């Protein structure tokens, strides 16, 4: 090897190795101080890219887990509000059951409806004011997407539904609304109610006054209706008619009449004080003149005593064919009922509803006048109309009864099948609560899965970018030794050119 001064190859070689060990020492110290194997892309370009993607996923999934917890909070907030709505609905149902009981007075129903209205208003208030972080969760139908992944499209949707009185089908819910008026309601709820029921018997039309029961013809100028005393037929003639049969007269009868012979025979066969019946009336033998049949008998008709005298029977006669009969009063037999009477004619009586029914009259509509207005009622009396519109009985704020038509009653009408309506509302609330409960469980599962994934990704990233302290400490020790050795050797290498000086001596 040539002996030169200008170039110290050994020194250069030693410096180069010293630089290498310096670089190794710097790298080891950097890794040990940061805890990372990859501190820059030059440490491991591919590993750095992989670890960076892991970091993105880990950070995204960690935030997704927080998002899922927010989703649980939203569901819990909504479900809590629905629970209170459910409580109000249960109370409304309880009150509705109470209202359907027939023992309630008008004031009872008003009190019940007042509380129901307050409960329904509270449901609307809860719906409008319940919110999570400024988002109203029950005031409208909405789909809220919760990001539960580190990438696009990785979401879980919470279906939020509008839950208020209207959406529950309880808008206008009422247990104390106007009820369809009946004729009975008009009579009991209003004063000075007048009117009549109509009846038809064949071609004949009649009216029956709803208050007095008087029967008249159904005409613009109605006539009073009577019952014919003889045949029971309806008539507008009130004159006396149906002449009665003059059975016992104050003038002596001709000999041998049926009545004279019958009574003479009773006297002949009896004794004074005996009684006997004739034509359904009891007679008493007052006197008996011998045993031929002559004598007197008496009876009481309509509270008055009547004496009949039998005479002109020849003493010792074998029969009573010569008997004559004379009465202290004229006595007649009614052709209507066959009873004894002092009247020679029977007067027609005013017709009654029972007389119409006896003549097979069929009830028609009724005309009822209330506060000057005339209403029409059907034959059953359970539907009252005015100008073709069904009428309802309502109450003013002061509790006074009033009549309103079907148009005015529509907005205030009692809810048909109120319990079924509330049960339907409860079912809807239950369905929404069930959905929210299920979504909470789903979020719990998603959070658990996200935690597992983050743990595994952290482990994977650690294996790529975290420093192995055993290895790095070993590398640092090696580099330190090489540094010390290199420094010592470099000092000796720098002295080598001085050997040339010995050649100059």
UniProtKB/Swiss-Prot annotation:
What keywords are assigned to this protein?
A: Bacterial flagellum, Secreted
**GO terms for cellular component:** bacterial-type flagellum; extracellular region
Q: Which domain of life is it from?
A: Bacteria
Q: What InterPro entries does this protein map onto?
A: Flagellin, Flagellin_C, Flagellin_C_sub2, Flagellin_N
Gene3D superfamilies on file = 6.10.280.190, f41 fragment of flagellin, C-terminal domain, f41 fragment of flagellin, middle domain, f41 fragment of flagellin, N-terminal domain, Flagellar export chaperone, C-terminal domain
Q: Which GO terms describe its molecular function?
A: structural molecule activity
> According to its UniProt record, where is this protein located?
Secreted; Bacterial flagellum
The family classification in the record reads: Belongs to the bacterial flagellin family.
What does the further note read?
Individual Salmonella serotypes usually alternate between the production of 2 antigenic forms of flagella, termed phase 1 and phase 2, each specified by separate structural genes.
Function according to Swiss-Prot or TrEMBL: Flagellin is the subunit protein which polymerizes to form the filaments of bacterial flagella.
Q: What is the official name of this protein in its record?
A: Flagellin
Which organism encodes this protein?
Answer: Salmonella budapest
